[in-house]
Amino acid sequence: MFSAQQPGPPPPNQPGAPAGLMSTPPGAKNPSSTLVDDLESSFEACFASLVSQDYVNGTDQEEIRTGVEQCIQKFLDVARQTECFFLQKRLQLSVQKPEQVIKEDVSELRNELQRKEALIQKHLTKLRSWQQVLEEINGQHKKTSEMPQGPLAYLEQASANIPAPMKPT
């Protein structure tokens, strides 16, 4: 869905703002707003369109759908621009300080190893408990197989489990 849509050119820099973070879309009310501000306002507009009093009062369903879709599309466009900005900054960082990127990669790999080790330990614990259950079942099976297997074996086994009557004193 998103792969066919190419992000637009990066927003122009404005004095006094972090490079590239300023956004001046055509027709914008606030020319000094940042991408983050635009993202926040478009996100709020998505919710505002859903709870608008016009929609509650019974406006045409197609009109509601169109308005919501426009708000969501604007939010997605600004989100793509913001993502593009951060990807550009990440690329600049990787060119200027490649050791920092390597440190981050090593840290991520260590965290992944710790997570996987914990998962292995969890599975080993479960495996040991199931092995114990199987050993108990095998032990019970061996006890029953040691019992005599004659025609009266069932009665002998059942009577072995009945406690002897107590003698009155």
Curated annotation (Swiss-Prot):
List every stretch annotated Disordered. 1-35
Matches recorded under Pfam families:
Med28
Coiled-coil parts of chain:
99-137
Which compartments is it annotated to reside in?
Nucleus
Keywords, in A-Z order: Activator, Coiled coil, Nucleus, Transcription, Transcription regulation
| Main localization, broad class | nucleus
Specify whether Transcription regulation is a keyword of the entry.
yes
Provide GO CC annotations from the record: nucleus
Q: Does the keyword Nucleus apply?
A: yes
State its role: Component of the Mediator complex, a coactivator involved in the regulated transcription of nearly all RNA polymerase II-dependent genes. Mediator functions as a bridge to convey information from gene-specific regulatory proteins to the basal RNA polymerase II transcription machinery. Mediator is recruited to promoters by direct interactions with regulatory proteins and serves as a scaffold for the assembly of a functional preinitiation complex with RNA polymerase II and the general transcription factors.
Its family remark reads: Belongs to the Mediator complex subunit 28 family.
Q: How does it assemble?
A: Component of the Mediator complex.
Instruction: Return the protein name.
Output: Mediator of RNA polymerase II transcription subunit 28
